[in-house]
């Protein structure tokens, strides 16, 4: 009896000892980095905050505290290095072996499987090579037609939403637009998300994206086995099944259509597309001399839909929000629209070639991505020891590449809190000092697609509307952005009490979002 009691009492101590010993080497090696002091077992988890917004503020605070350089922090027994050094970024992003994603991406596995976002090793290399032609110039032109069609529907919808000088959340509206575009381009189907917001598939996309963001900051729910005990797990399972069934059904029908040599052209058929969809390209591709199986097709289509929807929603939303606050830049953009398209032709779609001629629009989007990058962090996991810029980084470490910090480094970008698109004509950041779409062999394969969609939507909105802030008083009079992201602690705390309820509260998980929405008004141009 006493023996059993001793064992029972000793187990927690043995567990603590095991966990501490298992991290001993990593702790010893990583001690050379600056970083906040933590507690045994807990690390720095208790210091980081209770939600994604507080965590982002904390990480920025540490970045300032440690000289805007790399630093180490611990989440329990998980070691993390926040990376902003250009030499580190160059090594990591150029590496052919350091390509394993961090554990946070495991939250997407049940939905996405091991597609291009989450796979590694030979599978990733083969699939990357196979998928690259899907973003060829000619295919992007086809995709652009789809973007224009859906943007036209979006403009009509916005006219209704914005009527009567209504203040509305643009981020919420953009979600449905980008969902329509991605389903159309990825699978050749129209789900009409802008019109059918309550449909099961539209709601499933929204619920799944929310679920991934929520679980990322819930230690117990991040564990797949423990999450099965959570009260919201049954709802998650239903959402997952809805998405899987939807995608698999379309893939099966598309395979049959390809086998028969024809795709239905009946009016009203939801599977009709005049142009090649991403799925059609995959069905025409081979790996090791064989066609892709159903599982591989599902993984890559689902991955393309997730990456192409969530990141583009962020990019479009923050760009339009910045239009509302920075009226001088908006006037320059409208002037460019008239110069490129002609004063009397602003009501038509911009062609693929015309979008490429909009140089100030390109500068504006670059500056928008500098201050509000769609992907704020990239996580890589070291499966072996690496020597980076003379430092030993031990096996088992997560490298968090702080892309959102790069835009606020005054050594690279003078006066970083001033929104100034022209800076990209005058200031030339190094290849690893500004990487909103990552860089190197594992850069964002769909970055041209994303930029084309953002430019197409922003261009059409500018031609149809004056974009106004939620309240006139919120227009930036000095060119500075309204968020306190990236400011030193003392200055941020001084400004926080004066933040307006319509100023965005930023949160960062896999993509950058505003927790309180992005509120604007629109005034039709005549």
From Swiss-Prot:
EC number(s)? 1.14.-.-
> What keywords tag this UniProt record?
Endoplasmic reticulum, Heme, Iron, Membrane, Metal-binding, Microsome, Monooxygenase, Oxidoreductase
Please name the SUPFAM superfamilies in this protein's record.
Cytochrome P450
* Gene3D superfamilies reported in the protein's UniProt record: Cytochrome P450
Report the InterPro entries cross-referenced here.
Cyt_P450, Cyt_P450_CS, Cyt_P450_E_grp-I, Cyt_P450_sf, Cytochrome_P450_Monoox
- State the compartments where it is located: Endoplasmic reticulum membrane; Microsome membrane
Q: Which Pfam families match?
A: p450
Carries keyword Nuclease?
Answer: no
For molecular function, the Gene Ontology terms on record are:
heme binding; iron ion binding; monooxygenase activity; oxidoreductase activity, acting on paired donors, with incorporation or reduction of molecular oxygen
A single GO CC term, please?
A: endoplasmic reticulum membrane
Topology in the lipid bilayer is annotated as:
Peripheral membrane protein
Q: Which cofactor does it need?
A: heme
Which sites bind heme? Answer: 307, 444
| Keyword Acyltransferase listed | no
Q: Which cysteine residues pair off into disulfide bonds?
A: none
Top-level EC class as recorded in UniProt: oxidoreductase
Q: Which family does it belong to?
A: Belongs to the cytochrome P450 family.
Alphabetized PANTHER family for the sequence: CYTOCHROME P450 4D1-RELATED, CYTOCHROME P450 FAMILY 4
Function of the molecule = May be involved in the metabolism of insect hormones and in the breakdown of synthetic insecticides.
User: Under which name does UniProt file this protein?
Assistant: Cytochrome P450 4e2
What organism does the UniProt record list as the source?
A: Drosophila melanogaster (Fruit fly)
The uppermost taxa in this organism's lineage are: Eukaryota, Metazoa, Ecdysozoa, Arthropoda, Hexapoda
């Amino acid at each position: 009896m006493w023996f059993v009691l001793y064992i029972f009492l000793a187990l927690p101590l043995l567990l603590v000892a095991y966990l501490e010993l298992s991290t001993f080497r990593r702790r010893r090696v990583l001690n050379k980095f600056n970083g906040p002091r933590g507690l045994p077992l807990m690390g720095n988890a208790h210091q980081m905050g209770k939600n994604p917004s507080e965590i982002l503020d904390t990480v920025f605070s540490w970045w300032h505290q440690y000289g805007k350089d790399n630093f180490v922090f611990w989440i329990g027994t998980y070691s993390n290095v926040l990376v902003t050094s250009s030499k580190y970024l160059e090594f990591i992003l150029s590496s052919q072996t350091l390509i394993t994603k961090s554990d946070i991406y495991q939250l997407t596995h049940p939905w996405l499987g091991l597609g291009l976002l989450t796979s590694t090793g030979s599978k990733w290399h083969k699939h990357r090579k196979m998928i690259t032609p899907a973003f060829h110039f000619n295919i992007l032109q086809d995709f652009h037609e789809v973007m224009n069609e859906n943007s036209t529907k979006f403009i009509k919808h916005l006219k209704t939403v914005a009527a009567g000088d209504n203040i509305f959340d643009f981020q919420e509206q953009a979600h449905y637009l980008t969902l329509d575009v991605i389903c159309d381009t990825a699978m050749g189907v129209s789900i009409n998300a802008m019109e059918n917001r309550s449909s099961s598939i539209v709601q499933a996309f929204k619920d799944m994206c929310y679920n991934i963001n929520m679980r990322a900051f819930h230690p117990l729910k991040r564990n797949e086995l423990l999450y099965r005990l959570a009260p919201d797990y049954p709802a998650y399972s239903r959402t997952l099944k809805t998405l899987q069934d939807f995608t698999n059904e379309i893939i099966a029908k598309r395979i049959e259509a390809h086998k028969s040599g024809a795709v239905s052209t009946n009016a009203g058929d939801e599977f009709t597309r005049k142009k090649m969809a991403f799925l059609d390209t995959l069905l025409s591709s081979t790996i090791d001399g064989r066609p892709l199986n159903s599982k591989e097709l599902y993984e890559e289509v689902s991955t393309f839909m997730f990456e192409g929807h969530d990141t583009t929603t962020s990019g479009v939303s923050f760009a339009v929000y910045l239009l509302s606050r920075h009226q001088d830049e908006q006037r320059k953009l409208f002037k460019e629209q008239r110069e490129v398209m002609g004063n009397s032709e602003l009501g038509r779609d911009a062609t693929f070639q015309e979008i490429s001629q909009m140089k100030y629009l390109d500068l504006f989007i670059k500056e928008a991505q500098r201050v509000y990058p769609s992907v704020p962090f990239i996580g890589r996991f070291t499966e072996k020891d690496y020597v980076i810029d003379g430092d030993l980084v031990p096996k088992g470490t997560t490298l968090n590449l702080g892309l959102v910090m790069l835009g606020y480094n005054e050594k690279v970008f003078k006066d970083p809190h001033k929104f100034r698109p022209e800076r990209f004509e005058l200031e030339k950041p190094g290849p690893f000092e500004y990487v909103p779409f990552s860089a190197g062999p594992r850069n964002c394969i769909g970055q041209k697609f994303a930029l084309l969609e953002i430019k197409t939507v922003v261009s059409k909105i500018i031609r149809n509307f004056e974009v106004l802030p939620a309240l006139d008083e919120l227009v930036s009079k000095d060119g500075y952005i309204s968020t306190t992201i990236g400011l030193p602690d003392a200055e941020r705390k001084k400004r926080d009490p004066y933040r307006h309820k319509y100023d965005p509260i930023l949160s960062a998980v896999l993509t950058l979002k505003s927790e309180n929405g992005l509120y604007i008004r629109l005034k039709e141009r005549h």
